[in-house]
Amino acid sequence: MYLYIETLKQRLDAINQLRVDRALAAMGPAFQQVYSLLPTLLHYHHPLMPGYLDGNVPKGICLYTPDETQRHYLNELELYRGMSVQDPPKGELPITGVYTMGSTSSVGQSCSSDLDIWVCHQSWLDSEERQLLQRKCSLLESWAASLGVEVSFFLIDENRFRHNESGSLGGEDCGSTQHILLLDEFYRTAVRLAGKRILWNMVPCDEEEHYDDYVMTLYAQGVLTPNEWLDLGGLSSLSAEEYFGASLWQLYKSIDSPYKAVLKTLLLEAYSWEYPNPRLLAKDIKQRLHDGEIVSFGLDPYCMMLERVTEYLTAIEDFTRLDLVRRCFYLKVCEKLSRERACVGWRREVLSQLVKEWEWDDARLAMLDNRANWKIDQVREAHNELLDAMMQSYRNLIRFARRNNLSVSASPQDIGVLTRKLYAAFEALPGKVTLVNPQISPDLSEPNLTFIYVPPGRANRSGWYLYNRAPNIESIISHQPLEYNRYLNKLVAWAWFNGLLTSRTRLYIKGNGVVDLPKLQEMVADVSHHFPLRLPAPTPKALYSPCEIRHLAIIVNLEYDPTAAFRNQVVHFDFRKLDVFSFGENQNCLVGSVDLLYRNSWNEVRTLHFNGEQSMIEALKTILGKMHQDAAPPDSVEVFCYSQHLRGLIRTRVQQLVSECIELRLSSTRQETGRFKALRVSGQTWGLFFERLNVSVQKLENAIEFYGAISHNKLHGLSVQVETNHVKLPAVVDGFASEGIIQFFFEETQDENGFNIYILDESNRVEVYHHCEGSKEELVRDVSRFYSSSHDRFTYGSSFINFNLPQFYQIVKVDGREQVIPFRTKSIGNMPPANQEHDAPLLQQYFS
């Protein structure tokens, strides 16, 4: 036994040193400096060293001895800055060990990779000491960032994985998953920088079920000494719910960076395919270590992940996704084999061998190596391919849930957040701007863009066509347009938000008298100034809440301008009675077209077009209908007007009207349901009625209709009532109502006799059910299953998915006030207290 253990220790140390050497070889000088000095900066604590702060900061790493580089650094501090380095006190030190995890040291590490560092500490540290250590780590992150190195520290209590804690998407961590999969990744990718060796590697795979007993036997026999090893526990079996939660979160993360996430998403899919007897990759690597099979280029965890995914996709004969995952792997390694290198490193050798096995030709290598120069056609093709792969994973996840008798709403908040994000990113809707470049290519800018308008009555569809070339007949005729839409606003928005249109792009337009070049250039300047291209990704909280308009542009008279008729005419009007909506003797409306362009809190970009005399009324009703009563006001509202005449006047009046109506909408309350705004358009009076759930518009022909409409809205307040009796909603539900989503609100009755359900459909029509009995969880499961299986609303190529699943909420009382919280299958009161301060950053790391 002793010789066997010693042999294992030697293999472990050899592989760890190999990984350290490989990590340093792939790094630049600044990266090497940070990587090498981090253990020293955590072992010591001194005002002249980075990361210093006042207080009793835990210092000292168990079994740490400075290497040559670290000793040189300490000697320099002593020699040139007069620093006297004091070793931490003897005995068991607070920091058990410092480890990197993830792609560092693997073939997947690149010059742009960041560093994920686990600082494992003794469980006897108190709360204040942990906070001080966390603050020191934050200071070290800032120091590294000043050198151009991205480092993330994660404090790990040595006993945390024995608690089987879980989190939720709403807490911005890894969803309904326990920590076993995180531990799986740590065990297969960890590199020890300083401190204790990892004990788990010493336990044979066939003893995993009796992990603790086997470890105690090793200690009792004196084969191992307890205080020389980091013991985070064994890899126990995983439930179907845990796979579901982990896969859900990984799919969620893959939306923003699909190339990076494809391999890990498919590894989890492979695990679920093998369920209930999965082979965790960490166990596979450990088995080979024990057998002395140092395969896969030194048990490289990234290569072994590819190997496992290849086995899975080959077994199910999914060669389309297999080809995709190989390309993703190639791009991640970033070696560019089509270009000659003077120095051939180990990563290049690995990739060359794999490419030879895959039988790739030079043309494919050149195409992949040129990814930085991919333009819209290649990016759109890649986007569709990644989307198809993601949808396949989503469908397989739902099948896995059904196969194992799980509800797709086993965690309704989590599935709600994922579906909202999928819906926001991919559901194809009229007027929605599809963003096709989630970190696929760095630059889609085009030197030339041409907008061509085809009027009605021609062979081609009437509307606007966009080309990425100058308007010469030969090039236009021989190429397909990049995009078509009936309205110019949508094409400009698509080109801007996808990065084709920049300040350097030359614009051309063949507008057939509808829009000329100066007007197009003005619009492009206004849109680019008002809408930033890059925004932070929406938080899970934002995705679970009703969407809210964040940036709004109201574009007036872009395609139809009534003031153009004033040219060379004498127009009589009274400045004292000037009304741009009922102008002059003929009471003409000077707003002929309104285009809306807005970005919401889910980061969707939407466009809408309204034409004709009532365009202002229709646009107002639409804008206000998208603002639920408790919504925050938009961050910005801009009116852009492109009239030939009276431009400033029209713009100011529209801005005033919109601001006033938004104020009325967002400030209306249950006690003031009769608020209204009268507006005269083209000589006719219209009433906008600000009701509890939406805004209605009514034409008011005379005084009797006018006052009748006001009193009716004061009395009822609802434009639609499904019940014959008056529907009385809790005020907190009024504020949460949002168009476009089916919402269920559960409310406990005061006499504790069942519960009430308030259901708002996508048009905010209301149904109320009082004193319901039975299981809310079963209702949530059945409703979600019905919508996920029978309401296919999303169509993209061969993919059919319903993303707009109902949302479920619970009305609760907190400090005597009613609040709405996401409904969870486990009541808040019964949930174990979660240490979010420690859990969230760690779990973010695993699924990043």
From Swiss-Prot:
Location of the region described as Catalytic in the Swiss-Prot/TrEMBL record: 1-535
Entry EC no(s): 4.6.1.1
GO terms of molecular function: adenylate cyclase activity; ATP binding
Keyword terms: ATP-binding, cAMP biosynthesis, Cytoplasm, Lyase, Nucleotide-binding, Phosphoprotein
GO cellular component: cytoplasm
Record-listed Phosphohistidine modification sites: 609
NCBIfam families: PRK09450.1-1, PRK09450.1-2, PRK09450.1-4
Protein family membership: Belongs to the adenylyl cyclase class-1 family.
Protein's recorded name: Adenylate cyclase
